[in-house]
């Protein structure tokens, strides 16, 4: 659920944007946009000419020249207004985040445990590694990891989602964000950042976008626009000697008007606004992008790597069955599985403990009282377990346990292989339990594929995007779930190294890869991916490696991220097509008007039957300014997007924005010409 959306033309934002538009008239600000800088120079030049004409220092129609000059300044102001309005919307979103930051005190613990003595210190003095206690009603003072306890947390100030979430030590839900509120119970938190480096601080800095850099495609388009501007500038400059040689030299004011109408001012004036609005729309989806480059890359993505758990399935795998090996009692298997899971804080581990209680009334035992050593799960070993007395119990993936058994001189039973295959073919995940070198049996973990996910993958396939499911399950389980979900491919028994290798393989083929992640083990792959969406509930390492953060911690959001990225690219392309098509119509308005006196044959091009040369030129300049304002909503909201193939989208946009770009100026210029004539202004 997103926070409240701003109205497109919020009155306070419009007023502020108008002020900023005037401030941006300074040369330093204009220089950043070469196309509009040419318009700015033309405005300055025609203003000087108008003043000279009015004072009698130059011959000519001072009123006409002043009208042209005024509308050129308005053109620059409208372009500035579009950019300022987009920036203002982003800053307003940043200000809403700043409201989350509150001056508060924290209870800094002297020892890293609940009940230890605490000192009351200002929250902004907490450093990385400090341990704090937060209880019901408290604001979490820093970003960190829960090391003890569990609590219900209200994260609506950050995510906009009203439903509270559970944060607890261990597992995937241990990360907390400063500025959120504890609703119940208590947490002991280890701060993971220093002051000024919190997630909220980085969010605000990213959203404000003060250092927004142009993306590669934006730079390429700017170079194209500069090239077109130079071509039209040279062409316009050569027209004066031609007209002078014909005996009726065209005025500098008319030449400036011609140049401004021919260069791509529409897209030139809206280009920055489109980029800023793309990042703003991403925030509207509760995704923070670190740069416009990340948003743009999302639009070019053609491979999606999707974690099975939480993205394709509901992500709440639960132990559903104990399947003992031949010669092993089911209760013996359940007892060993529970012992191996006593210190396992993952949902799967806890479900194993609960299932053993339910089936055989095996009460949970304390690891410390048993004088046992817990062996945590790692991405490399893909096992966890416990060492107690002379017993060494492990649970983990089939391959990991097989290697463990063989390394200890044992043999992996064929009947267990059959049981593993049976569980996997049912779409469940098999975990194998072993004591020493003796395999005790299999635990079945069951998950459910999300409703409607198959249809979404079909849409992505239609857009030319390949979907790849990433899972730690064995190949049989992965194949069953992949077939049910409708993904194009899958990577089974995935390790961090395998994910990284797969991304590099696709990139070597010239593809752009997007993925999501939330764990420290995802960080290398997130850093390598072109679009890397880290979950807000994930670890600090994952957030730092990604170039986007999903505040809702919803892995399925990756599909929406791609949608927004493609919409931004389509908006830029559509308005570029519209802008260039505009020039053709303006050519038919100004060229006959400017040169008909010198070359009467050009009257044949006056297909719009405009009233007079002056009205034709002024109408084209007015239209050139007004079209920027009319297109601001489209630049900010983005063009309508549908999941189509690239060729189908190109045809659609050429018809709508190419043909529209030709017809709209003909109609608009003719209407303005009629109004000027009826009102006696020309």
From Swiss-Prot:
Modified-residue entries (Phosphoserine), positions: 162
Effect annotated for changing residue 300 to E/N: Does not affect formation of the phosphorylated intermediate
Record's bilayer topology term: Multi-pass membrane protein
Transmembrane segments: 34-55, 62-80, 223-242, 252-263, 575-595, 613-631, 654-678
Molecular-function GO terms, alphabetical: ATP binding; ATP hydrolysis activity; magnesium ion binding; P-type potassium transmembrane transporter activity
Positions that bind ATP: 344, 348, 377-384, 395
Active-site residues per Swiss-Prot or TrEMBL entry: 307
Pfam families with a match to the protein in the record: E1-E2_ATPase, Hydrolase
Periplasmic side: 56-61, 243-251, 596-612, 679-682
GO biological process: monoatomic cation transmembrane transport; potassium ion transmembrane transport; potassium ion transport
Modification after translation, per record: Phosphorylated at Ser-162, which leads to the inhibition of the ATPase activity.
Outcome, altering residue 377 to A: Loss of ATPase activity
Its EC number(s): 7.2.2.6
Stretches of the chain found on the membrane's Cytoplasmic side: 1-33, 81-222, 264-574, 632-653
Cell compartments where the protein resides: Cell inner membrane
Enzyme class of the recorded protein, top EC level: translocase
Purpose of the protein: Part of the high-affinity ATP-driven potassium transport (or Kdp) system, which catalyzes the hydrolysis of ATP coupled with the electrogenic transport of potassium into the cytoplasm. This subunit is responsible for energy coupling to the transport system and for the release of the potassium ions to the cytoplasm.
PANTHER family: POTASSIUM-TRANSPORTING ATPASE ATP-BINDING SUBUNIT
Domain notes: A protein-embedded tunnel connects the potassium ion in KdpA to a water molecule at the canonical cation site in the transmembrane domain of KdpB. The structures suggest a translocation pathway for potassium via two inter-subunit half-channels along KdpA and KdpB, integrating KdpB directly in the transport process. The periplasmic potassium ion probably enters the selectivity filter of KdpA, travels through the water-filled tunnel to reach KdpB, and is released to the cytoplasm by KdpB. KdpB undergoes conformational changes, whereas KdpA, KdpC and KdpF remain static.
Protein name: Potassium-transporting ATPase ATP-binding subunit
Gene: kdpB
């Amino acid at each position: 659920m997103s926070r409240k959306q701003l109205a497109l033309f919020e009155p306070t934002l419009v007023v502020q944007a108008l002020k900023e538009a005037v401030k941006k008239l300074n040369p330093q600000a204009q220089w950043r946009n070469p196309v509009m800088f040419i318009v700015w120079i033309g405005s300055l030049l025609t203003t000087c000419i108008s003043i000279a004409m009015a004072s009698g220092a130059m011959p000519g129609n001072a009123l006409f020249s002043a009208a042209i000059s005024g509308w050129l300044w308005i053109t620059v102001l409208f372009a500035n207004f579009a950019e300022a309005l987009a920036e203002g919307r982003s800053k307003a979103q940043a200000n809403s985040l700043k409201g989350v930051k509150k001056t508060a005190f924290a209870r800094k613990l002297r020892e890293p445990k609940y009940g230890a003595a605490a000192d009351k210190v200002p929250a902004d003095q907490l450093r990385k590694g400090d341990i704090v206690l937060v209880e019901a009603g408290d604001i979490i003072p820093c970003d960190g990891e829960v090391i003890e306890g569990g609590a219900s947390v209200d994260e609506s100030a950050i995510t906009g989602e009203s439903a509270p979430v559970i944060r607890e030590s261990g597992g995937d839900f241990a990360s907390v964000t400063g500025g959120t509120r504890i609703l119940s119970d208590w947490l002991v938190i280890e701060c993971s950042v220093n002051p000024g480096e919190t997630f909220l601080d980085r969010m605000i800095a990213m959203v404000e976008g003060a250092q927004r850099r142009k993306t590669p495609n934006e730079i390429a388009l700017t170079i194209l626009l500069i090239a077109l501007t130079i071509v039209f500038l040279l062409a316009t400059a050569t027209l004066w000697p031609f007209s002078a040689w014909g005996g009726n030299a065209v005025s500098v004011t008319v030449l400036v008007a011609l140049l401004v109408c021919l260069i791509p001012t529409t897209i030139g004036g809206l280009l920055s606004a489109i980029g800023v609005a793309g990042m703003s729309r991403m925030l509207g989806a509760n995704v923070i992008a670190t740069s416009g480059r990340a948003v743009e890359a999302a639009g070019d993505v053609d491979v999606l790597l999707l974690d099975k758990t939480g993205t394709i399935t509901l992500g709440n795998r639960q132990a559903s069955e104990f399947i003992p090996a031949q010669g092993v009692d089911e209760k013996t298997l359940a007892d060993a599985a529970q012992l191996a899971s006593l210190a396992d804080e993952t949902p799967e581990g806890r479900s194993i403990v609960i299932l053993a209680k339910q089936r055989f009334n095996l009460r949970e035992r304390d690891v410390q009282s048993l004088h046992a050593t817990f062996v945590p799960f790692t991405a490399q070993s893909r096992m966890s377990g416990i060492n107690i007395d002379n017993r060494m119990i492990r649970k983990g993936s089939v391959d990991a346990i097989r290697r463990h058994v063989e390394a200890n001189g044992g043999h992996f039973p064929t009947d267990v292989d059959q049981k593993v295959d049976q569980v996997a073919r049912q779409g469940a995940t098999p975990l194998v339990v072993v004591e020493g070198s003796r395999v005790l049996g299999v635990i079945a973990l069951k998950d459910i594929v999300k409703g409607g996910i198959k249809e979404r993958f079909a849409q992505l396939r239609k857009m030319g995007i390949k979907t790849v499911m990433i899972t730690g399950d064995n190949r049989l389980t992965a194949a069953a779930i992949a077939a049910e979900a409708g993904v194009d491919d899958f990577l089974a028994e995935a390790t961090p190294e395998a994910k990284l290798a797969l991304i590099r393989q696709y990139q070597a083929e010239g593809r752009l890869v997007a993925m999501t992640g939330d764990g420290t083990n995802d960080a290398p792959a997130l850093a390598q991916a072109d679009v890397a969406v880290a979950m807000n509930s994930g670890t600090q390492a994952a957030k730092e490696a990604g170039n986007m953060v999903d505040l809702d911690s919803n892995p399925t959001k990756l599909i929406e991220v791609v949608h927004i990225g493609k919409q931004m690219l389509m908006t830029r392309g559509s308005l570029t097509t519209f802008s260039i098509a505009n020039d053709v119509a303006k050519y038919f308005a100004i060229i006959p008007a400017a040169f008909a006196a010198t070359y009467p044959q050009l009257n044949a091009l006056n297909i719009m039957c405009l009233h007079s040369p002056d009205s034709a030129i002024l109408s084209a300049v007015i239209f050139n300014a007004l079209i920027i304002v009319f297109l601001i909503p489209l630049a900010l909201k983005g063009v309508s997007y549908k999941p189509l193939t690239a060729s189908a989208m190109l045809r659609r946009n050429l018809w709508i924005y190419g043909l529209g770009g030709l017809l709209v100026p003909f109609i608009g210029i003719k209407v303005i010409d009629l109004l000027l004539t009826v009102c006696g202004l020309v």
